[in-house]
């Protein structure tokens, strides 16, 4: 193992010791459980240090660490940091550095750490679940300044959350959201537990987490769910033993080191706060530039379509006499063959909510040909626009 992996294992071991001393149940993440069960090496990705806890246990763990903080360690959450990106905890080694330069404000102490994700109960009422879901979505959207795509509902949730932050203050709003989350999603007698991540949501039967068993990972003992096989099957499928760890390459936007602390690094490199502000400005400019680029690309595609439509219109005008003659003779088979390019161009125009009618007489002949040859789908689309 390299030094970064050793730091993560040491943090996992500290979490294990704290939980055992205080009767708190925790479980290794599916990825780490897979590595332990299949005897694969510890993941290279520094973000794969993850454990799971039930919501009430996670809150107990947070309070224990706050009451008895450890040297060169930090526990972050929405309760303590107004830019924290979600409903989870992060236990960090402050003598290291692990920072995404595109998300510089996510953590107050950007060191190598272990994320503690909550197992949510499914017994929450529909109204409360919907309310928390909207709030979580709004908070996530507000924290992710680099997001390029944002749907209508996401924009509404983000706007409402921004207004609430302006009224209550961002730190107070973050703390309220976290407290409401803990209050709503904890409770005994749950039939299912839900693990919600940024890109994936998994649902587990409660029996899986009824107890724990011990596994060995890199020479250290950790806890995993008693129903390990079902746990891994839900996450990775029946062939989970065949899954191999992909080769990991640190992205250019990441700085990861176990040899130097984030404070020392920025002391040598320059003003951290100033750098974060400049980086955020550049990120916003980049997001705007991408939006403009997408808009200009769509405009250019429309210009190309209009040019192709104009050229095809000129072509059909040059063959107008021939088309009129076929129409007088009611030769619809020949007309259908002649109008094939016209049909394709009409389809493209209808996608834009427009008609391809460069010449009215030719267009009328084309519509009549559609009706006579049984192409009623496009005929009905044209009728809705006329």
Predicted regions: what they are:
Residues 16-49, 53-59, 207:
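Active-site nucleotide-donor binding segment shared across nucleotidyl transfer reactions
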Residues 310, 345-356, 386:
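Boundary/linker segments of alpha-helical solenoid repeat arrays
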Residues 1-20, 62-134, 138-235, 242-281, ...:
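Conserved catalytic core of two-metal-ion nucleotidyltransferases
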Residues 299-303, 333-345, 375-386:
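Alpha-helical repeat scaffolds
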């Amino acid at each position: 193992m390299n030094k970064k992996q050793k730091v993560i294992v040491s943090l996992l071991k500290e979490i294990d010791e704290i939980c055992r001393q205080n009767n708190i149940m925790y479980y290794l993440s599916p990825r780490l459980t897979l590595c332990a069960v299949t005897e694969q090496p510890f993941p290279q990705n520094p973000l794969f240090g993850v454990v799971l806890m039930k919501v009430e246990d996670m809150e107990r763990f947070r309070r224990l660490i706050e009451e008895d903080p450890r040297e060169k360690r930090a526990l972050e959450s929405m309760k303590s940091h107004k830019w924290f990106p979600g409903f989870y905890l992060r236990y960090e080694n402050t003598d290291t550095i692990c920072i995404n330069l595109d998300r510089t404000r996510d953590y107050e102490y950007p060191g190598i750490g272990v994320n503690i994700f909550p197992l949510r109960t499914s017994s929450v009422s529909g109204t409360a679940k919907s309310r928390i879901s909207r709030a979580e979505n709004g908070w996530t959207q507000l924290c992710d300044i680099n997001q390029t795509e944002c749907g209508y509902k996401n924009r509404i949730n983000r706007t409402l959350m921004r207004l609430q932050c302006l009224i209550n203050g961002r730190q107070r709003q973050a703390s309220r959201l976290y407290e409401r989350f803990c209050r709503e999603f904890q409770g005994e007698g749950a039939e299912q537990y839900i693990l919600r991540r940024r890109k994936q949501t998994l649902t587990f039967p409660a029996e899986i987490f009824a107890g724990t068993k011990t596994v060995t990972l890199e020479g250290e003992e950790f806890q995993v769910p008693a129903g390990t096989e079902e746990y891994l099957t839900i996450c990775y499928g029946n062939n989970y033993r065949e899954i191999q760890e992909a080769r990991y390459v640190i992205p250019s936007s990441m700085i990861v080191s176990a040899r130097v602390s984030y404070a020392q690094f920025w002391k040598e490199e320059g003003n951290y706060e100033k750098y974060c502000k400049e980086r955020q400005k550049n990120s916003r400019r980049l997001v705007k530039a991408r939006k403009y680029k997408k808009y200009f690309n769509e405009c250019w595609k429309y210009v190309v379509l209009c040019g192709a439509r104009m050229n095809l219109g000129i072509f059909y005008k040059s063959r107008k006499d021939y088309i009129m003659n076929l129409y007088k003779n009611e030769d619809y088979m020949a007309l259908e063959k002649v109008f094939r390019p016209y049909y394709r161009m009409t389809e493209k125009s209808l996608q834009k909510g427009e008609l391809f009618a460069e010449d009215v007489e030719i267009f009328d002949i084309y519509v009549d040909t559609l009706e006579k040859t049984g192409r009623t789908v496009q005929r009905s689309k044209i009728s809705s626009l006329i």
